[in-house]
Amino acid sequence: HNILNNDAARIDMPVGVINGAKDGPTLIVTGGLFATEFSGVEAASRMYRDFDPKDISGRLIIIPVITLDAFQFRTPMFNLSSGVSPRDGKSLNGVFPGNKDGSPTEVLAHYVFNELVMKSDYHIDLRGGDLSESHVIHSIHPNNADRETNRISEDMSRACGFEYFQARDVDPRSLVYEASQAGIPSIITQCGLGYKTQAEEDFINSHISAVTNIMKHFNMMAGSPIIHQNQKEFTVGFDQVRAKSFGTFQGIADQGDILKKGQLIGRVTGLDGSVLEELHSPINGVVHELLVRRVVSQGDLLYNLVQIKG
């Protein structure tokens, strides 16, 4: 779909619509909000290819890649900058609900938000760990909308079926925040080892399973969601582990690992092999995210750790 076309910029975005055989709600699924989170992109593409209208009640809108220019230019999110458009240097996930008279990224955000998200009943954003990230599989729902929207979003987050889910005060001007503020229940599925670039099947299938479960939850598909038997909720916020030395980072713990307080999780070494620093877990918890940097400076974020409620 063409959104902007002038002498300065042309913006296109792939949009797939599956109109079900029966009436029902409208669900919009977005991928590629951060364009190098490839597992979400691949999952969205496969769902458009494989989902049969005969099996659907309602309408499913699928955007495999919102930020097509960043996807084509392989613009990552990394330590110094969020993933940005090569057209105007802006991050799409920081300019919602957009501006029809703004820069190219703001025009794109305005179209996605007003013409697609606001005309839907529910929204799922498929994420996948960016090129610097190794993420545990989990779902995220906003905790800072009105009570009813928060409730429905949490129901969606649980219905994904993952072992872990998390409530979060999401950032203003992000897609999930602005959608939920407008009364559109909106969640994130986070599945992927972004640094591998070739998205692994387990993570792709986790996205697809989550969307399928949510469609069953809303009676858009027949059957009942398949839910992990022992779901756990992450606490809000992170315990961060940062480098205190300049050197080469050797990660020992990875996403999903269960940690004891004081456990060795990594080292920073010199080029002569000397150990400059040992990294230990500050909590009993779970590795939410490993930042897969090799060369690190003082202050670089290496781990986000979370605790489990209860």
Give the label of every model feature segment.
Residues 1-310:
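Structured catalytic-domain cores with a bias toward divalent-metal coordination
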